[in-house]
From Swiss-Prot:
This is Ribonuclease Z, mitochondrial. Zinc phosphodiesterase, which displays some tRNA 3'-processing endonuclease activity of nuclear and mitochondrial pre-tRNA. Probably involved in tRNA maturation, by removing a 3'-trailer from precursor tRNA. May participate in tRNA processing in the developing embryo. The gene is RNaseZ. Homodimer. Keywords: Developmental protein, Endonuclease, Hydrolase, Metal-binding, Mitochondrion, Nuclease, Nucleus, Transit peptide, tRNA processing, Zinc. Its main location: nucleus. The lineage of its organism: Eukaryota, Metazoa, Ecdysozoa, Arthropoda, Hexapoda.
Length: 766
């Protein structure tokens, strides 16, 4: 509410004469809210304290991840002053980045399970929000969350972020000025030590806002009388007229409720059924009506009749339902990956294949619950038919919104969509691109390699540190034989990348044929996807044989904790320490089934226990065995040169551009030219650059004087054979033309950096 200080105020005189339509605009424009000024933007903690007791006027629930095609099932609740996240699977922060959902204001995280499907994105997300300046955050959910974070401390270093774990298994959970969250613990009927947490969230009631227009119409003078009306008191004007508070305030908003359900297996159904009466009673109260139910429950449970019956009996016909992980949710929400792939696909379709995931949600039977934009607008006939339809659903995608306050209803206007024609048109509008593309097509076309070609190198993640909307973190899939794959590093979201590139059916086949995973070192961006990949592989029917896990032995405490306290994945792998291969390469029958004759490692110049690796394959090229060397993260390293001598392909990190050599040294990474020189020094036939800083989201800045004839730039979802690499450099004219505006921006940044350095040098000389 805005209080005018005196009757002589020019603002108030203006209010008396303005039309109603302009009145509120003038009031809003004139108000100087002390809580939103620049001073408080620089002091978020002060702002938070000031708003601690304010009940928000806007509350929206946003689907961040729909659970489709390897995407997480995650929901973001945001209000005027706070943010809450419900579940945080792998890829959550990448979706947040893509859809401009700010995580820097996140205050509370609620997890329904402590298994990887619900919390796999937590390590990366906590590191990211720590860098964004968040200093403390609440973490609510099942037992062992605190000990899980403790077990991650080797690779999730939280020096400036305090995470406050809260075990919600006893029922009490969380309350602030915005909402109250009660937990519904479900105990596994076969194993009482295991539990999941469901949540009942109840918004605090909000008093109706004072309507200044109505106050003016009633002749209320500015001053304390406005405050009395705001507080719900009737007043008497000097002329004896009584003005009732109810006549000049908007309707108050009730303590609306919304529910999160997660029933991961049939063993939790008996516990769920015991909560039916409580949920039904909550929904029958007008002041606490259940407007929305979000189902994290997997489809094989939510499709059961017992679950459907529970939903019908426990919630009113007016409650709306959002089903995450439904088979109708067919688009992951990673639109930027499709965009760049459609653009690159024009250059070489077999090197940059279109992504295999389903591109749109196919609506089946639409229920009333998701057809209606506003609950209040449902007519009586539709309501009468709702009973039969309320457990049916249509697909949702990232950015499906539900407005809880000020109005209740589903909003699809911001949903993530794919527009392939627009992606291609963007490149056609670039001056000179079509001419260069036509010239390239006339002069050369890549060999028509079949889908069964091998050796083949598939890049699933080519960015460093944190996921970007176009470059995921490190992961490289090598097809070593017709029925064998090896994975080099396994950053967050690796499984999702496989499914989105190849589709579900082929993705499952690749998962079965995956024979080994190599982890170069224990920085989070190189192995956070490991647990998720092992879980998915373990669920294959029939069960796949254990794969070989090559990793630093220091990963053992983390894996032992997860196997002991959370869930078993240890039967899905056999651990071999990278250090054990320093003196004695892995060879013989153990690796022959991988299409490999030997695997060797070396220490590289990065963090402690960082390794490079070299694979010698049984497959040959030009009558010679194919040798693939991968640097992991490293500065220029002689031991790596010796290990990879005469490699067919060197895959080397190129985190920084050449101008940032000192920064690369401080962070123990390599520049582009350093990586290329490493290839020359080891006499590698081809060098592929990867692990780019996320400042080079589309294309890295390359040195103008380098010979790029034997050098390729890696992109996510790029797959190349040895034959492809021989001709990759011919793509560069069209590629750089396509991203000319972006590369020009990189050049301008470099010039600004150089000018800044020059000023520093001159100041130092004076």
């Amino acid at each position: 509410m805005y209080l005018v200080k005196s009757a002589g105020s020019p603002i108030y005189r203006t209010l008396r004469t303005l039309t109603t339509s302009n009145l509120m605009a003038a009031t809003i424009a004139s108000a100087k809210d002390p809580l939103t000024g620049p001073r408080y933007e620089r002091e978020p903690n002060v702002l938070r304290k000031k708003l601690a007791s304010v009940v928000p006027g806007t509350v929206n629930l946003q689907v961040l991840g729909s659970g489709a095609n390897g995407a997480p099932a995650a929901v973001y609740l945001f209000t005027d002053q706070a943010r809450y996240l419900f579940n945080c699977g792998e890829g959550t922060q990448r979706l947040a980045h893509e859809h401009k959902t700010r995580l820097s204001r996140l205050e509370q995280i609620f997890l329904t399970q402590n298994t990887w499907a619900s919390c796999g994105g937590l390590p990366g997300l906590t590191l990211t929000i720590q860098d964004a300046g968040v200093r403390d955050i609440g973490l609510h959910g099942p037992p062992h969350l605190g000990s899980m974070l403790q077990s991650m401390r080797r690779f999730v270093v939280l020096k400036n972020l305090q995470v406050r774990p809260n075990d919600c298994s006893e029922g009490a959970c969380f309350e602030d000025s915005i909402l109250k969250v009660d937990s519904l613990p479900l105990i596994n009927s076969e194993d009482p030590t295991k539990s999941v947490i469901n949540y009942i969230c109840q918004l605090k009631p909000r008093a109706g806002a004072l309507n200044l227009v109505k106050c003016v119409e009633q002749g209320v003078p500015p001053g304390p009388l406005l405050g009395q009306l705001k507080n719900g008191n009737d007043i008497t004007l000097p002329d004896g007229k009584v003005v009732r508070s109810v006549d000049v305030t908007e309707a108050s908003e009730t303590a609306l409720s919304f529910v999160f359900l997660d029933v991961p297996s049939e063993n939790y159904l008996p516990a769920l059924l015991t909560h039916g009466k409580r949920l039904k009673k909550l929904g029958e109260e007008k002041l606490t009506e259940v407007a929305l139910v979000v189902h994290f429950t997997p489809y094989h449970i939510s499709s059961r009749q017992v679950y459907k019956d529970f939903v019908v009996e426990s919630f009113s016909s007016e409650a709306q339902h959002i089903y995450l992980s439904s088979p109708l949710n067919q688009f992951s929400g990673y639109a930027a990956a499709h965009r760049i792939q459609h653009q690159l696909h024009q250059l070489a379709p077999q090197v940059f294949p279109l992504l295999g995931e389903q591109l749109s949600c196919q609506s089946q039977t639409l229920s009333l619950n998701l057809k209606k934009t506003k609950l209040d607008e449902a007519d009586s006939e539709d309501k009468a038919n709702a009973k039969a339809n309320e457990t049916e659903e249509q697909g949702v995608v990232a950015m499906t919104n539900y407005h809880l306050r000020p109005r209740k209803g589903l909003d699809r206007t911001l949903e993530s969509k794919l527009t392939p024609e627009e992606y291609v048109k963007e490149t056609h509008a670039v001056p000179g691109f079509l001419e260069l593309l036509a010239k390239f097509k006339e002069e050369y076309s890549f060999p028509d390699n079949s889908a069964d070609s091998y050796p083949k190198i598939i890049f699933l993640g080519t960015g460093s540190c944190i996921p970007n909307k176009t470059r995921n973190v490190s992961s490289i899939l090598i097809r070593t034989a017709i029925d064998a794959y090896v994975l080099l590093d396994c950053g967050e979201g690796t499984y999702g990348q496989i499914v989105r590139l190849y589709g579900h059916e082929k993705g499952q086949l690749i998962l079965r044929q995956l024979q080994a995973i190599y982890v170069s070192h224990l920085h989070a961006d190189h192995h956070i996807g490991l647990i998720g990949l092992l879980r998915e592989r373990r669920q294959l029917k029939p069960r796949a044989d254990p794969l070989i896990l090559l990793a630093p032995r220091q990963i053992e405490p983390w894996l032992e904790f997860y196997n002991r306290q959370i869930e078993t994945v240890e039967d899905a792998y056999t651990l071999v320490g990278n250090g054990e291969l320093l003196a004695s390469p892995l060879s013989g029958e153990q690796v022959e089934r991988l299409g490999i004759t030997s695997i060797s490692t070396c220490l590289v110049r990065h963090c402690p226990n960082s390794f490079g690796i070299s694979l010698t394959l049984a497959a040959k090229h030009n009558s010679e065995p194919v040798k693939i060397t991968y640097s992991g993260d490293t500065m220029p390293c002689q031991d790596l040169i010796d290990l990879g001598r005469d490699s067919t392909v060197l895959i080397h990190e190129a985190t920084m551009e050449d101008d940032l050599e000192e920064e690369a040294r401080l962070k123990t990474h390599s520049t582009v030219s350093q990586a290329i020189q490493q290839g020359r020094n080891m006499n590698a036939r081809h060098t592929i650059l990867t692990h780019f800083s996320q400042r080079y989201a589309k294309c890295p800045r390359l040195p103008s004087d380098e010979d790029m004839q034997r050098v390729a730039i890696a992109f996510d979802n790029m797959e190349v054979t040895i034959e492809d690499l021989q001709h990759y450099h011919k793509l560069y004219p069209a590629l750089f033309a396509m991203y000319a505006e972006y590369t020009e921006e990189l050049e301008q940044r470099a010039v600004k950096r150089e000018l800044k350095q020059e000023r520093k040098r001159k100041l130092a000389e004076t």
